[in-house]
A protein has these predicted regions:
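Short, hydrophobic/aromatic-rich segments at coil-to-beta transitions
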Residues: 9-15, 130, 139-141
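Pre-active-site segment of Zn-dependent metallo-hydrolases
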Residues: 15-60
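Short, exposed beta-strand/loop patches in secreted or surface proteins that constitute
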Residues: 3-8
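Active-site HxH/HxHxD metal-binding segment of metal-dependent hydrolases
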Residues: 41-133, 171
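Short acidic/glycine-enriched loop/turn segments that link adjacent beta-strands
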Residues: 10, 21, 149-151
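Divalent metal-coordination and catalytic microenvironments
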Residues: 12, 27, 37, 49, ...
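Metallo-beta-lactamase
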Residues: 33, 40-41, 132, 139-182
Length: 182
């Protein structure tokens, strides 16, 4: 059975660790919460989030890759930049998801019932630069950061000056794949 680990980063922000080294973040305002990324889609991330907050949750996807967006099927309100629809569909294929998981050290703990069905990106709300998400007492601003994918987005938590980058900027950001902008 897949379990997630969570660590409080600040009063508003909790970092959630997935089994494939992916990181997700729960940002809580006074009225609602935003989950940034949903990981690989093995095990119920939604159950973990419900233990962390009783507020309504929206999901903001930094991009459509297998390790960032495949758990979105558990959630009602999901935002993604639709420039990533094609890569989301490709990475949502069962074979790609299981291959990605096999790279994880915890692969032996996963059973088929842990598999979360891939969502239809057509049901996601569009996400674009300039979108603002007021969570009550704190706001997430959306910025385009195309490169890693054609729809990569980052989110700034104004009040704490925390920038959530997904894979837009790190030591392993791939910029040479078919879906990257190079």
């Amino acid at each position: 059975m897949v379990t997630y680990k969570a660590v409080k980063v600040s009063d508003r922000v909790t970092r959630i660790f997935g089994i494939c080294t992916e990181l997700m973040y729960l940002v809580e305002g006074e009225d609602k919460a935003a989950l940034i990324d949903t990981g690989s889609g093995f095990g119920s991330l939604k159950q973990t989030v419900e233990k962390l907050t009783d507020k309504p949750v929206i999901v903001l996807l930094t991009h459509g890759h297998v390790d960032h967006a495949m758990g979105a099927g558990e959630f009602e309100t999901v935002y993604m930049n639709h420039n990533d629809d094609d890569i989301f569909k490709k990475h949502g294929q069962s074979s790609i998801r299981w291959d990605s998981l096999r790279m994880s050290e915890e692969y032996v703990e996963v059973v088929s019932s842990d598999y979360i069905e891939t969502a239809d990106a057509g049901r996601f709300y569009p996400l674009k630069e300039g979108d603002r998400f007021d969570l009550g007492g704190c706001t997430l601003n959306t910025y385009a950061c195309y490169g890693h994918t054609r729809g990569s987005m980052v989110f700034l938590l104004e009040e704490e000056r925390i920038l959530f980058l997904g894979d837009a900027c790190n030591s392993r950001t791939f910029m040479f794949q078919d879906y990257s902008l190079t």
